[in-house]
Each structure stands twice: as structure tokens, then as C-alpha cells.
Amino acid sequence: MAQPQRPLQVPDITKSTHSGGNTVLAYASSAMQGYRSTMEDAHATIENLDALTNTSFFGVYDGHGGSAVARYCANHLHNKVLEQEDFSSNLANALRQSFFRMDEMLRNQAASKELTEYGSGNEYWRTAGRSWLRCAPCVLGPVYCGPLAEGCTACVVLIRNTQIVVGNAGDARCVISRNGQAIALSNDHKPNFPEETQRIVAAGGSVSFSRGSHRVNNGIAVSRAIGDLSYKNNKKLRPEQQLLTCSPEIRADQLTDDTEFLVIACDGVWDVLANQAVVDFVRLHLNNGVELSVICESLLQEAITRDPPSTDNMSVILVRFLHPEGNRGARAATSSTSTGTVPSRHSKSISL
């Protein structure tokens, strides 16, 4: 179990901000370390994941126990979605399978070098992370077992023409604004929620309240996450049945003319700002002509100056739907005249 970070007396409010867009949407992202001693969040914004299907990808990864798994997901998960056989025909299933694929990749020796590079600056990683190579004492020689006590929650959004598909594991959240009404497109996954508790107990675990949160086996305070492989070692259970599962909850929605924007953010934002408060904040600034990047930075500043303030890392992605005239037809024309080039390696921003 990861040791809690010692909070900073003065928060680091330096913000890493990026913006971009295409013919149908504009976006901005911003991240801030805040009161935490290290930055463990990561995110990916890829407005042109696939030209043939007009698919965009946005994801927030909230790390715990270190930043390595969050950064690894930000670097790889969107590519795994693109590689799925169902990518063109069943976006929801492609997204679901990609979450499971991340845990599979983390168990593979090939991931060790990249993960170690990402985690080299984290004190917990340097100390507890050495147990990776000692987790199978019955085997002669070192055995790689993946990140046992480090992981991340993940909230990912895929946008394709008029389709919005959200995959979520953990307590990051996606909220859309429809005519000013905040509508959650994801549910938080906490150990004390009945469906989550049922799975945890069935897997032989327990849920208890300690250190201000409900926890799985007195450890992790979320019930779904990528990584944290020490909770996923029961070989008699399928991945979705483990104490902690990376199985995402999938929600789908239709992009309509009254869908204004969506916000993806980690729990550091939602812990102090309600869904409707965030939508109202964004709408007010949009109506005043404020740039998306400034809105994102202002939202993080709002969260850290609340009473009480957010004491967590904070990351936010804001996607505004442009609804240009002829938008639907323009997308169809782009798809039908495409040369087949898939620009998955550009028009993207990945915050590691």
C-alpha cells in the first residue's frame, strides 16, 4: 500500500496547459500539482485519433503510489483502442478491451523499463518498487510482476461523429453540459457502493473505513483502477471479478445541437466543486468570450482557493462542440474521401 504524501505548506500552482481542436471541436487541458509533494496525474488529448472514422480521444489518468502507471496509460491506452478489432464497428467494446489490455501490458516484462523511467523521481517508487523483483520467492532469479502498489484511475472519452462513448474506472469523472444542465456521463467507483462491495466481498476481501475513506482491505480507496496488481492475483477469478478491477463502466450518449461542452477531471476537482457548479463556471466564462485554456486554468485556481481547498493534484480537459453549419455532412464527406492515412501520431498532446 502506498504511503500517503506529506502535503506542501505552500501549493505549487504552476499550470501545464495545452489547447487545440479540429473542424468540429475545440479543447484545452490544464494540470496543477497543488498541495501534493509530487505530480501523479497524466492526461492525453488527441483530437484526430483516426481520420477514417472521425474519432477523437481524451483521457484523464489520476495516479496513486506514484506517477508511472498514469503516465504509461497516457502514452499507450489510446493506441490500444485504435488497435482493437472492434474499433470501427463497436467503439464501446474496443474501449473496454483496451482497459484490460493495459493491465496485461503492465504485467509484461517489456513494460518495466518505461515504468522505471517514469517512476524514477518518486520516493515511494524507489523504495517499495524494488519489491517488484522479489514477489515470487519460490522462483530462482528475479521475476517481474508489474506495479503491485501503484496504479491510476482512468476516465476516457471517445467522440465519433454524433457518438460520445465514456469509459471510467475509478473516481475521475466526465460531465457534459446540455443547455446548461450538468449531466454526469460516468459514475465514481468507491468500495462502499453496494455493487462494488458485493464484488470485493465475493473475491474474499473486505471494506472498512479508515483515514477518512472507505478502503479495500484497509488499503486503496477506490474499487476500480488500472495497475495495483497486488489486488488482482486470484487466478480463480476473471479480471472483472478481482478485489480491484480495471473493468471500465461504459456510458454512451448522442451529440445533439444542445450539447455544449464536456469536462473530464480528476477527483481533485470534483471533491470541492459539484457537477453543476463546474458547468455554470465554464458557461459563464464562455459567454464572456474567455479562451478555453484560460477557463481550464481558472477552474483549477477556483478549486485550490475554495474553503476548504482541494489538496490533491488536479487535471482537467474541456471539450467544446463547435456545431458548425453542415457539420454532420462535412464529417461524412471527410470519411468518404479519406486516403486512409491515420494521423494517430500527430495532432495530439500527452501530459506525462
From Swiss-Prot:
Keywords, comma-separated and alphabetical: Hydrolase, Magnesium, Manganese, Metal-binding, Protein phosphatase
One Pfam family from the record: PP2C
The EC number(s) this enzyme carries: 3.1.3.16
Record's keyword annotation contains Coiled coil: no
PROSITE patterns: PPM_1, PPM_2
InterPro entries in UniProt: PP2C, PP2C_BS, PPM-type-like_dom_sf, PPM-type_phosphatase-like_dom
One BP term from GO: signal transduction
Residue ranges occupied by any PPM-type phosphatase domain in the UniProt entry: 26-321
Keyword Magnesium: yes
Enzyme class: hydrolase
Cofactor (UniProt): Mg(2+); Mn(2+)
Free-text remark on how the cofactor is bound: Binds 2 magnesium or manganese ions per subunit.
Region (Disordered): 328-352
Family: Belongs to the PP2C family.
PANTHER family in the record: PROTEIN PHOSPHATASE 2C (PTHR13832), PROTEIN PHOSPHATASE 2C 42-RELATED (PTHR13832:SF760)
UniProt protein name: Probable protein phosphatase 2C 42
